[in-house]
Each structure stands twice: as structure tokens, then as C-alpha cells.
Amino acid sequence: KKQYLIQPGDLVSVSWSSRISNQLGFFKIELIETTVGKIFNDKIRLDIISSFCSLTSFILPERENCPFFFQKSKTFLKEIPINPSNNEVLKLYIFWELDLLNEVGTPLNFSECTVSGDKKNLKYVSPKSGNAVGSSFAGKYENKLLKLPFFLGGVNVINNNENDDIFSGFSLTLFFIKKFLDTFDFNNLTKLLFARIRLQNNFK
């Protein structure tokens, strides 16, 4: 009866009850706070919600409690309709994807160079380890390394504008999301990641 009131990205309270625990029961769903209703005419933020819901639906393990990640996701969802800057919301979304990767056991470390331990002049990310690499240690592997955006702790490259930086962030997290999904031998990553790829392409 209340299906029309609830949209993807909304915060709801869900309870399940049954006369006997091993029999079929029913769910009671109450809307706590809407997100989509506040951004209905904002295409990029609707794309963010679509990607958010898509990734959580097939990446997070079923029936596993994720209290800390839930709180981070809740905080992010609340930010979507109130933050005046689309670019800032997109950056927050990329941080959320990093939290998602961490939640499923694929943490990325941008705090120091994986070769030297230096915390300065970080420019790349190793596609193998997910760790940052300093600009002086790329060597002959430079073309194989991923770019570390400025807003994620990378060096501020001359003539690199904010949109380029955000797109590099999208490319970085998408690489590791695909790498994680490859471990499960999904046959059609493009279909599974349709909403996520659409978000990145529409921003581009």
C-alpha cells in the first residue's frame, strides 16, 4: 500500500513479524526520510542515488550486519539533497565508494608511498596493491599506474582542473570495484555496473 511513497535512496524503518518464527511473516516498512523527493529535478544526483543503490544491492553480502558502513551511508545520503555543490557531492560519493570497498575487504591506502613510506608527493596508485606510489618511484611502470586525485591526497598537478580530478577519482574506484567483482566471476560486469558507468559517463 505504501510502495508509491518509498523510492530508492529513502531512509526507512523495516520490521518483520510472524505468528511463528519458522513460518512466512510480513514486513512493515515506514518512511523516515526521503532523499529522491528533494532532488527530483537534479539529474546528476539522481544518477548518484541510482549508482549507490545498485552497488549496495549486489556488492554487499546478504544478511550480514554492516553497522559502521550503514552509518557512513546514512550520513552520505543525508548530504545529497543539502550540499549546494554538485562537485562536492560527487567527491563525497567517491569517498563512499572507498568505504564500500573497505567494507568488502578491499581497502585502498593513500596515506603513504608503498615503496618508500614517504607521505608527500603521492601521485599514483598501484593497481595490484591499491596503495599510493610517490611521483619519484613510478619509473618504467608509470603508464600502468592509476592516477591519485588531489582531493584523495595526490599532488596538485599543474593545469589539472577540478572536473578532471573528480573523473580520475571515478576511474580509480571503478577499477577496484571491477577487480573485486572479477573475483566472483560475474559474466556481465557491464550490466551489473550499468548505473555506475552511466554516472561516470554523464559527468564526463
Regions found by a protein language model. Give the residues of each.
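Non-catalytic alpha-helical scaffolds and adjoining flexible linkers that form interface surfaces
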Residues: 1-204
